[in-house]
Amino acid sequence: MGFDLYGEKPIQNEFEHQERWDELSAMSYDERESKGLEDEYYTLMSKYENVNPGAYFRNNVWWWRPLWDFVCENCADILTEKDMNGGHYNDSHIISRRKAEAIATTLEEVIESDETKMWIKEHEDNMEQAKRNNAQVEAELEELKKLVEVETGNPDIYPAIYPDKFKKKYDEIYGKRDWASSYPFNKDNVINFINFARQSGGFSIC
């Protein structure tokens, strides 16, 4: 699962393969596939998006959540509550061109600030702490698995079919997992988003 952002009226920068890109884009998937053009299509797509960053931006859910939280934290005077909530769902919520440009400007201003550096460090520290915690959780789950195998005599047993007393213990241990380890955040992703927002002409969040 991920979040796909599409520029509403993206700036069209000069692209040396524009004619070929238009030709391939006009074809259906089946047509490109039958002619062996899919690899060329995706190669040109990557080049096109690099030249035209306002056309498309994607993050998987793990990267998007902390990025959008960062946007909301710094752009509360730009975004409405509806905008902020809309960024957490794949419901095609639209951020206007004016707001997109204002977001880009604001993030450019804060990206090198001490506050942002602290935000990034705290996020990295939380991730490392979560990873250490989760390593301990995995070790406990492995010990429990060995115990269950001995008790049941079944080396192929898995949590869903653990006897009740062991399933309860499994749920208790698993509940200690810290999901902060799954949500990365870094400066490069913010910069890529800034470039997209600046040239998107407004964007939809899908």
Which residues are covered by each model-predicted region?
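Acidic (Asp/Glu-rich) sequence patches and key acidic residues
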Residues: 1-206
